[in-house]
Amino acid sequence: MKNVAVIGAGSWGTALSLVLADNGHHVTLVARREEIAREINERHTNETYLPSIEIPSSIVATCSMEEIIDVEIIVLVVPTKAIRQAVRSLNDVLKWPVTIVHASKGIEPGSHLRISEMIEEELEPTLLKEVVVLSGPSHAEEVSLRQPTTVTVSSKSLSTTKQIQDLFMNQQFRVYTNEDLIGVEIGGALKNIIALACGLTNGLGYGDNTKAAIMTRGLAEIGRLGVKLGASPLTFAGLSGLGDLIVTCTSIHSRNWRAGQMLGKGKSPAEVEESMGMVVEGIRTTQAAHELAQKLQIEMPITSALYSVLFEGKKPEHAADELMGRVKKHEMENLHDVVSDQKND
């Protein structure tokens, strides 16, 4: 049994806490809101984020970082914009080096850093053993019901990756290892952009043909940028690429899909986030990916079209028309060029 802290008591943080508790680990779940922590400890529920799910007594909630000083592993499950502050706060409380597993999906606008890079920047080197990413098609609602789910873990250290695989894996939660840290993080982050686009086209009244086109061409965009950043193209055919893309673009559980649908129906980005009452990672990631694409001179037309809707005020139907009216191309044109560049490197 290990002492594990999970920072973030939303739906995904709570669901991962359940997996760890099922595996016999003692879990300290750090919540931002006092009422959430109290409910978990007293009523053993988290109705705000995971309605009707019983939380075992082996999960103890707190709002104080001071209560995680004795942990061996920290699972970080907070929005990308909160990563730096959350990690920075650990510098004053940790007593020894820890492994940080992050289950967040995003890229930081401006710096264009992946989450593992942000963690490495903020945590004192003497307090960090390794950063591991956990990603894949894994809706919290289904994980909490113990429905069969598969995910991928990756880090710079294969031995550490295997340790985290053992930490989480059970009969309902199957964990694969992957040595492509960049690819796993990029796939998990960028699929939120494509989910927004799929939801947007649904809001416009378009059907399955459009959704299939967005998903397929969206995966090509993810691959182009990912490979340029050093990822393996094979990773995007796996759980953290295609797998996560499918589940996020087709499920009612997907907040990015639902946000996109609202955009397609005419709501502004601000109205969407206010209506949902939670962070929509795909909005910030669209900004970061658009900036990266321009910097690296990579064509990402779906991302660019979505950026024009989110940040330039373009009407969704006009963005869709422009996307369809682009100059004709070979299906594998840009992806082939990027893969060739990687081989030459």
Curated annotation (Swiss-Prot):
Keyword Lipid biosynthesis among UniProt keywords: yes
Active site: K191 (proton acceptor)
InterPro entries in the record: 6-PGluconate_DH-like_C_sf, 6PGD_dom2, G3P_DH_NAD-dep, G3P_DH_NAD-dep_C, G3P_DH_NAD-dep_N, NAD(P)-bd_dom_sf
Keyword annotations from UniProtKB, A to Z: Cytoplasm, Lipid biosynthesis, Lipid metabolism, NAD, NADP, Nucleotide-binding, Oxidoreductase, Phospholipid biosynthesis, Phospholipid metabolism
GO cellular component: cytosol
Keyword flag Kinase: no
EC number: 1.1.1.94
Xref: SUPFAM superfamilies: 6-phosphogluconate dehydrogenase C-terminal domain-like, NAD(P)-binding Rossmann-fold domains
Top-level taxon in the UniProt lineage: Bacteria
Pathway(s) per entry: Membrane lipid metabolism; glycerophospholipid metabolism
Gene Ontology annotations of biological process type: carbohydrate metabolic process; glycerol-3-phosphate biosynthetic process; glycerol-3-phosphate catabolic process; glycerophospholipid metabolic process; phospholipid biosynthetic process
Described function: Catalyzes the reduction of the glycolytic intermediate dihydroxyacetone phosphate (DHAP) to sn-glycerol 3-phosphate (G3P), the key precursor for phospholipid synthesis.
Record-given protein name: Glycerol-3-phosphate dehydrogenase [NAD(P)+]
Protein species of origin: Halalkalibacterium halodurans (strain ATCC BAA-125 / DSM 18197 / FERM 7344 / JCM 9153 / C-125) (Bacillus halodurans)
